[in-house]
Amino acid sequence: MPFRPPLRVSVSRYEEKEQRLRQFVSQHLNAARPHPLLVVARSLDSPVVRAIAGLDQTIVAAGGVVRLILAQVDDEAQCLAGAALSCAHEIRWARHPRLIEAHEQLVVGPNTCWIGDCMRRDPAKCDAFENYVEDCGEAAGCAAVSFERLWFASAPLKGADAPAVAVAAVAAKGSAQTSLPSRQ
């Protein structure tokens, strides 16, 4: 039976959530090996999106890119989508109404992720479940796979695409480092 590291599960107050997420992301950003931040969130008002927006200059300095899937988009959010983040980013809208039953998530790297509360709960009205996962490639890998599947099924928002040059630079830098021999 494989060893599973203990998870940091907590219930956090709304006022603390954005700050804790910001600390978690900044702790795990790695300029030497940039990894796109993969985010599934309820809306642009979600604490995880606000935490990422608060770190956008740090993300730029680390050479990172943000890929964001929103469950709820109104006209104003769609207009603001291109200005939500100043770092390189792409935003998509998961139009399927059943997505609201899913949990918010953030993948910071190949071994690090955060799982938030169910998106049907308004984060401004109640305290929320959170799960900080560190040093677990299995959990982060599953979160990344589910993100990619949802990304494929989601619709791009106009004005929210990352500059192609920034995305290509991160991809090229990542592929150069992943070409190193690995243990099988």
Q: Can you say where each PLM-predicted feature lies in the sequence?
A:
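PLD/PLD-like phosphodiesterase catalytic module centered on the HKD motif
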Residues: 1-184
